[in-house]
Amino acid sequence: KDPMTETFRTNVRQALMTGEPGFSFNFGDKQGETLRNACTEITSFSTNDVCNIGSVNMANIETPEDFKDIVHLASKFLVCGLIRAEVPSKDIEMVRQKNSRLGLGLMGMHEWLLKRGYHYEMNRDLMRWMNIYETESEKAANEHCDRLFLNRPKGYRAIAPTGTISILAGTSSGLEPIPALAYKRRYLVDGTKWKFQYAVDGTAQSLIDDGIKPENIESASDLAADPERRIKFQRDVQKYIDHAISSTINLPAWGTDLNNEDKVEEYAKMISKYAPGLRGLTMYP
């Protein structure tokens, strides 16, 4: 079915203007599933489903062998959460016991790429790591569920935005590129007054300290001029994720040369092109 309907074009135009709506692609082999949470990384057919999620910091892992061990341990840890974490109702508990849904995610992916001299795109090295991630997360979770007499999980992997925890971990968030080398951050004081501070991105500073030239560090600001690279990379990583990926495609402001009424058809065709390989897509001008 041709997705290029007038309704689709209208929604694309609105997303380019305001960032709303986001898109959920539930067709083909994704027929009937729904993005189940606000960050959109969990998909399910069940209305009362829950998912035990956690993230591995790729940027701090040096070798594929270490990565395999950490993915194995992290998957077993999430399985333990299926019997320890409390849920608000019996209906939800019944669905959790039935589905045993897990969402082992990744953060620090862009830092991992930059440390190895890669651009924000799929490459053979990353493919090797993603194959380990896919295979070992399922193997470890299945083995541990069998050991604990739990149902094997309906899903294993989901990449959440990891906004706050990636700041605490000192790395890039989820799949996202570094927002900018330097930026102005605002924060609320006493719940009433906004204050501002200028900051060099901590991940960027760490990379610069390690000898990487600032001009070689791509950021979300740089990639905003080439959104297809962002969407293509999300599609390429999605091949290894059985839930979904939470990622926001940064765009120039509406009314500028790269985001305006004349670009709506181009963006609509671009989204339509990659939609079969995506579960969700969010843009923010």
Locate the predicted segments by residue.
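Polar, glycine-rich mid-to-C-terminal structural blocks
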Residues: 1-16
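General structural feature for long, well-ordered alpha-helical segments within catalytic domains
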Residues: 7, 49, 70, 74-77, ...
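Function-dense linear segments that define catalytic or interfacial modules
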Residues: 12-116, 182-191, 278
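Acidic/polar loop patches that form or flank catalytic/metal-binding clefts of enzymes
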Residues: 22-24, 121-122, 283
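Catalytic alpha/beta core of large soluble enzyme barrels
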Residues: 35-47, 54, 78-86, 159-161, ...
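Internal maturation/activation junctions in enzymes
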Residues: 75-93, 97, 108, 113-165, ...
